[in-house]
Design a protein with these regions (language model features):
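A structural-propensity feature for long, helix-poor, extended segments
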Residues: 100-133, 298-360, 366
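Catalytic-core signal marking the mid-to-C-terminal active-site face
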Residues: 317, 324-426
């Protein structure tokens, strides 16, 4: 019989599991939770402190995609994902471009944004004049929080007022842009915003006799001014395909479709983000924030479309991906998680901008490999071959039967039904 509980967070791990056993778990299934604990207690404690109410660890494969030549540097890129074919596709894309110049990147900008949302009942012109004349004092008021970041080249970049009163009475916003050096900067930005809001409220009230109502202070995960571009380029004749011009034309058209059709664009970008997320997770970055920002960026013109584009002009194939990436190489999980720390070492201890370039290039490699597969062999042929092991495991195939199935399906189409039929005959 399941029941609600008060004070669950105060229970020990053993007590939490006991409560789950009594209320939700079938007999004996709690042992699965224990199987994934680390035998090293200190190591296990690190993991348990990442989140709340922890009762076990959830493992994901940690993989390597080699042969990434990015801005002249060769990388073996760590990727964390449970999805079949993602790492294989990224690796295939990296290998293809390794001998064709690799990936060239540029950081378009690296500004991040936070916002102070407030209501104010005075005249907009008075507020605008107040902001203009007090920007320097606003920045100075936050020095206790920003001084260390400023020594690393970061800090407050701009402060501007946004007026929303035409659509929401008395509602304004202070838009504050930051540079956060090699940190993702979420905690830093939020701390500065709260400190600034206190000073702003007191100063505005003193000068105008009208007190603002601070609604909230929070960073934005939409970072259209923290953007990286990754690009690949080669002659059409350098493609291995027999009918290179025919296939590169199809390729260009496939990417173009993702520019004009939202249904295709969502799946197209999902494939690109497979690579982005996998490297973000491996390096301890917030893939959910990255996902949210990327998809908002894809719809920045009012229509959701592809994050990548492709041209074939004068016998030259060019593909590029442009996306916002607010990532860090210091602070947070990047240093707390042993594998996140190792990932950054594998990537030769990159700066945050270098990590932006790496992640964008993996996303582009992923996207290139997926589209190439779509316009040549079709997505299922490669994906289902790589997914075969998962199907066999799910159906309980023995090691010897699984081995024979792998050989059989080298020359046969893979599907769940086909695998089931094969196993039934054994």
């Amino acid at each position: 019989m399941s029941s609600s509980i008060s004070g669950f967070s105060k229970l020990s791990k053993a007590e939490k599991i006991q409560w789950l056993r009594l209320n939700y778990l079938p007999d004996g299934s709690h042992k699965i939770l224990e199987q994934f604990w680390s035998s090293d207690n200190a190591f296990q404690n690190v993991f348990e402190n990442f989140s709340e109410n922890t009762v076990s660890n959830f493992h994901l494969p940690y993989s390597i995609a080699p042969n990434f030549l990015i801005d002249g540097t060769l990388y073996a890129v760590p990727m964390v994902t449970e999805e079949s074919s993602v790492v294989a596709a990224a690796s295939a894309g990296a290998k293809f471009w390794l001998k064709r110049g690799g990936f060239k990147t540029r950081i378009i900008n690296n500004l991040k944004e936070g916002q102070i949302h407030f209501n104010w009942a005075g005249e907009a012109q008075i507020l605008e004049a107040f902001i203009r004349t007090n920007i320097e004092s606003f920045i100075s008021a936050c020095k206790n929080t920003t001084s260390r970041m400023e020594k690393r080249g970061g800090g407050i970049n701009t402060i501007t007022l946004r007026d929303f009163t035409a659509i929401e009475p008395q509602y304004y916003q202070l838009k504050v842009q930051f540079r956060t050096a090699d940190a993702m900067g979420a905690n830093f930005i939020n701390s500065v915003l709260e400190e600034l809001a206190d000073f702003f409220s007191v100063r505005l009230t003193a000068e105008t006799n009208i007190e603002p109502t601070i609604i909230m202070c929070i960073l934005s995960n939409y970072t259209p001014d923290c953007v990286v571009e990754s690009m690949v380029q080669c002659k059409v004749s350098e493609f291995d395909d027999k009918n290179a011009e025919y296939y590169t034309d199809k390729f260009q058209k496939a990417v173009r479709i993702a520019q004009i059709d939202t249904y295709r664009a969502v799946t197209h970008n999902k494939g690109l983000m497979n690579g982005v997320d996998a490297v973000a997770i491996a390096t301890g970055n917030d893939f959910r924030a990255i996902e949210a920002g990327a998809h908002a960026f894809a719809a920045r013109d009012g229509v959701y479309k592809s994050l990548s584009e492709c041209t074939v002009e004068g016998g030259v194939f060019t593909m590029r991906a442009t996306l916002p990436l607010a990532v860090g190489t210091v602070g947070g999980l990047t240093r707390l998680h042993p594998l996140a720390k190792l990932s950054l070492e594998l990537l030769q201890s990159p700066t945050s901008e270098q990590l932006m370039s790496i992640i964008a290039s993996v996303g582009l490699a992923q996207n290139f490999a997926a589209v190439r597969s779509l316009v040549t062999t079709g997505i299922q042929k490669g994906h289902m071959k790589l997914h075969l092991s998962n199907i066999l495991n799910e159906m309980g195939a023995s090691e010897s039967v699984a081995e024979s199935a792998q050989k059989y399906f080298e020359s046969h189409t893979v599907s769940v039904n086909a695998v089931r039929d094969y196993l039934n005959e054994k």
